[in-house]
């Protein structure tokens, strides 16, 4: 058996590759999970897909040698190629593969926001939880990944509570605002249009209002959703069909939609710029896939930054949180060890259950013999004897149970010896 994670993220792959591999909806993830769980060697599977990463976590079924583990890896690569209609050669070199201890430690880092573009941003924990819930709904997890994902979320909670890594919350949206503030001195005099009413757009809006912005416009394909957020933040909702007209009178545009295509095209801006007398317009595209055609950046007075361009802002946050990240890493390592203690204890569970079942069987048989011999005993005394014998069994079984659960170098010999000592092998024969 083996735990494997195969993926790519903002550190290993540019946005052009990530957007080709991303699963852009819950339905896409569900479809992918259904396909993967049918593949040979895959016993359990969870997919995490965000703006900055795509990762597939697998608990392999009946795979105990390196050759077959490699076959599972190739199976996943082939699946990604077929599902996204992209040649393996286009993305293979950007992938990372972690197994067993490294895989568990990596997941715990991801859930705790230690592997994020901005260390400490809280959104990833919720995204990991949602990814797990989708896998649960599709029944592609069982004992191992259920426990692993729950421990990942528990680890993230420990990191959040036991370190200061979450102080002054940051996110990709916050980094976008930081970039805007470097360019414009007085945000209160500028107008901003948010294209998209999802989580990322709302986060950006909160940060902008906190920075003094007042002239906020918001457009979304679902106008009702745009109105709801605009009302909450004293902004103005703009019908999506009026996007081009709104660009004429906007200084800054932040795009964060789930559209699989360009929402703002080069041709659109060629028509818009003369109408705004070629005044500079500033775009930040934090969508994956990208919503603003990269060709727009070639137009005069159009300044376009995508999610990868936020790295400079991100770096300053990483430096500030480095000390807290070191504390968090010690928590991750501690929880990784605990996970494998639990995993290793599973080897002895069948033996422990068999020993306890045998002890209980003997106890019940002896009580029945006792009751048959002393038929006139009051029920209260029988109940006391039943309780007493249960207590004796539990006390006798405590030390063997602890010994079998604990990790040790010769655990296989210990399990073998326990089976022989308690006569389990002879019963099965």
Curated annotation (Swiss-Prot):
NADP(+) binds at residues 196-201. It is an enzyme of class 1 (oxidoreductase). Belongs to the glutamyl-tRNA reductase family. PANTHER family: GLUTAMYL-TRNA REDUCTASE. This is Glutamyl-tRNA reductase. The keyword Oxidoreductase applies. PROSITE patterns: GLUTR.
């Amino acid at each position: 058996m083996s735990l494997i994670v195969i993926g790519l993220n903002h550190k290993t792959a540019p946005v052009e590759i990530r957007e080709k591999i991303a699963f852009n909806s819950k339905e896409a993830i569900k479809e992918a999970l259904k396909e993967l769980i049918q593949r040979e060697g895959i016993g359990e599977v969870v997919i995490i897909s965000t703006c900055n990463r795509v990762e597939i976590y697998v608990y392999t079924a009946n795979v105990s040698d390196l050759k077959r583990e490699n076959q599972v890896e190739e199976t996943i690569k082939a699946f990604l190629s077929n599902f996204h209609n992209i040649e393996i050669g286009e993305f293979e070199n950007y992938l990372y593969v972690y197994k067993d201890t490294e895989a568990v430690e990596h997941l715990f880092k991801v859930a705790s926001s230690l592997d994020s573009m901005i260390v400490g941003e809280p959104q990833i924990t919720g995204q990991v939880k949602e990814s797990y819930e989708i896998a649960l709904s599709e029944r592609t997890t069982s004992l191992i990944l259920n426990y692993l994902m729950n421990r990942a979320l528990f680890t993230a909670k420990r990191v959040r509570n036991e370190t200061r890594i979450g102080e002054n919350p940051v996110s990709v949206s916050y980094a976008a605002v930081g970039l805007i503030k470097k360019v414009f001195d007085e945000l209160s005099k500028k107008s901003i249009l948010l294209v998209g009413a999802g989580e990322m757009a709302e986060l950006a809006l909160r940060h902008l209002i906190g920075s003094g912005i007042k002239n906020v416009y918001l457009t979304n394909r679902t106008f009702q959703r745009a109105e709801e957020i605009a009302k909450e933040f004293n902004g103005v909702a703009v019908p999506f069909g009026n996007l081009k007209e709104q660009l004429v009178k906007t200084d800054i545009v932040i795009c964060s939609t789930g559209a699989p295509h360009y929402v703002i095209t080069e041709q659109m801006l060629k028509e818009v710029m003369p109408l705004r007398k070629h005044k500079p317009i500033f775009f930040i595209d934090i969508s994956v896939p990208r919503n603003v055609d990269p060709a727009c950046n070639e137009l005069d007075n159009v300044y376009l930054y995508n999610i990868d361009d936020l790295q400079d802002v991100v770096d300053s946050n990483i430096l500030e949180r480095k000390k807290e990240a070191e504390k968090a890493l010690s928590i991750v390592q501690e929880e990784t060890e605990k996970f494998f203690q639990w995993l290793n204890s599973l080897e002895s569970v069948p033996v422990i259950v068999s020993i306890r079942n045998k002890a209980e069987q003997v106890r019940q048989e002896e009580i029945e013999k006792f009751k048959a011999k002393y038929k006139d005993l009051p029920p209260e005394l029988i109940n006391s004897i039943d309780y007493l014998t249960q207590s004796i069994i539990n006390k006798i079984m405590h030390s063997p149970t602890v010994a079998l659960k604990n990790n040790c170098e010769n655990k296989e010999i210990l399990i073998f010896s326990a089976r022989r000592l308690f006569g389990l092998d002879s019963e099965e024969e």
